[in-house]
């Protein structure tokens, strides 16, 4: 007699294959995430006077500012350039992450409630 909520004799063949495929996909995703975390993404703003670098962990690792961009009378402009460069670097990181996940999932964007 089957256990309540289970299948007689264990999982059907297709379900077993599906589980193996899901486990393989999970391993690949973990490997890709580890690779991504070791990468850096840089972006510039203001014609290159501000450069921001973020890691695959989405942490700012470096900010370079050309001294000519520092105007004590216009600090707001420098702040805007830093924000713009940071957002662009984060966008590059996100694009790379999505591209890697698409390779693994084969474009199953809705799988898992949109986790990918």
UniProtKB/Swiss-Prot annotation:
Residues 1-12 have a biased composition (Gly residues). Residues 1-42 are annotated as: Disordered. Coiled coil: none annotated. InterPro entries: YbaB-like_sf, YbaB/EbfC. GO terms for molecular function: DNA binding. Pfam families: YbaB_DNA_bd. Disulfide bonds: none annotated. GO terms for cellular component: bacterial nucleoid; cytosol. Residues 13-26 have a biased composition (Low complexity). SUPFAM superfamilies: YbaB-like. It is found in: Cytoplasm, Nucleoid. Its main location: cytoplasm. Keywords: Cytoplasm, DNA-binding. Belongs to the YbaB/EbfC family. Binds to DNA and alters its conformation. May be involved in regulation of gene expression, nucleoid organization and DNA protection. Homodimer. This is Nucleoid-associated protein EUBELI_02017. It comes from Lachnospira eligens (strain ATCC 27750 / DSM 3376 / VPI C15-48 / C15-B4).
